[in-house]
């Protein structure tokens, strides 16, 4: 852990953000990665096993005195949430009891853009918009959460456009 702490301390002078993508778990790689952290962002999906793992990681972060812990919920499928087949963002947030800074819908665009080597944010998709909003929240901006209902989202956008016209 001392080496990563030293490395991150040296990098702080040159960078506003230093992101370390670390493995979830209790092994040494995780412990080394969080040693220099002053903030943690836990990314999970709305499946029971993933939430259980996220809860364990949050406990480890708290045990290591990392006080600023946020949550991103990835691969939300509004149609499944609506049918009761998937936990909602609120359900996951209630279970894990840490602030949610983003929810990313599960979209075909993600797979397509990754396979084509295209940046998702340029695609104009809901997932791309969610990623941009997460970045804005990380930088301290207050950004409302988007409606994950793809059909209602389109209607809201159209009505918003018509109101401006």
Predicted segments, located by residue:
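P-loop NTP-binding site
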Residues: 99, 129, 133-165
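Secondary-structure junction/capping motif
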Residues: 87-88, 119-120, 153
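Conserved catalytic-core segment of NTP-binding enzymes
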Residues: 2-112
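Generic serine detector
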Residues: 49, 88, 113, 125, ...
